[in-house]
Amino acid sequence: MRETKSARLTRMHDEYDILRQVIPAPACALHFSNPLELLIATVLSAQTTDKRVNTVTPELFATYPTARDLAAANPAQVEDIIHPLGFYRSKTQHLIGLATALDERFGGVVPRTMDELTSLPGVGRKTANVVLGNAFDIPGFPVDTHVMRVTGRLRWRSDWRSAHPDPVKIEKEITSCFPPEEWTNLSHRLILFGRATCHARTPDCANCPLSDTCPSYAPPAGKST
């Protein structure tokens, strides 16, 4: 029997209530002390892990504490610092270009709106939402691979069958189901749940707190449902 929209919404909130209990204090995994640092760290996090980003940002932030400092940086020195992350040459170009635009257009101050943030080179909606939600406490719902995977398996979104889901569509559909004050922590919890339990290749269904209601639940071999 096909699940109605009303039933799906009820299930979504029930499952999120469980995630709130399992993950009571979610937080951004990137280390930062101001909006500029978070913006830079988020840009660096593409195609690598937050944990690895945190190993290089202390030196990067200490060496280039302002957007103007980073804009005037010697690219080779930046490359040397962020080399462990991979793609260090292109990331260096992106960082210096971003810092230059930030300094020239916003006086080095990270803007607080989606439109202004996404006008900066290399800043998309995901990065902007991370900055808005975590640096400014402005509701934002970052959609990364974990969020796409988990919302698909839970069938929280209508295009759960899609092999190439649209992050913007996911953002709009999921945020329409939850109050704005929950958006940032909702994203955090889905990401943490995806990392800890709902893995990409081998989800840990046997220890999943949502196994009773998850439409994609797969019982361990030899166990009947």
Where are these regions (language model features)?
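Catalytic cores of DNA base-excision repair glycosylases
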Residues: 2-223
